[in-house]
């Protein structure tokens, strides 16, 4: 598969699994008083860029979460993000994130070539593509990273510690299993990729 095809499948997978959020998701960022939005929880400059692609989005750009909430506009922002134009903008930006940020990071992992495994890792990249890259690089010599089940087990049992967020360990274990179930069942035959045989 080409990088573009992998990026597109990664973007589609992030949307279909909902591991980062729904199209219309709006919450307060854990990093400050600004909105975290959409199916990839964009915030800050990336969030403002997303809003710039949607008619009416400029009204929300640069505003704090509390300002939007206190003015009673959270549902309006959610509706904007969930609109057809909002969904199209998110898919475009997500595909671009996968191609421009996540694929180059994963490309630095030696001997990491299996298409399903790359798609699996892409679905973790929104947590931090640099942490995912280092996580895989640090395990490259000791584990077969071209084995989807091995990747699932590594992310389920070691990623929360490696990412220094043990409080998410249970959620990450669930995410690891959900992503595995999604990626293992993908029909990638159009790209010449065989069915997963686990």
What would you call each of these model-derived segments?
Residues 1-108, 115-118, 122-198:
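Cell-wall polysaccharide-cleaving catalytic domain and substrate-binding groove, primarily
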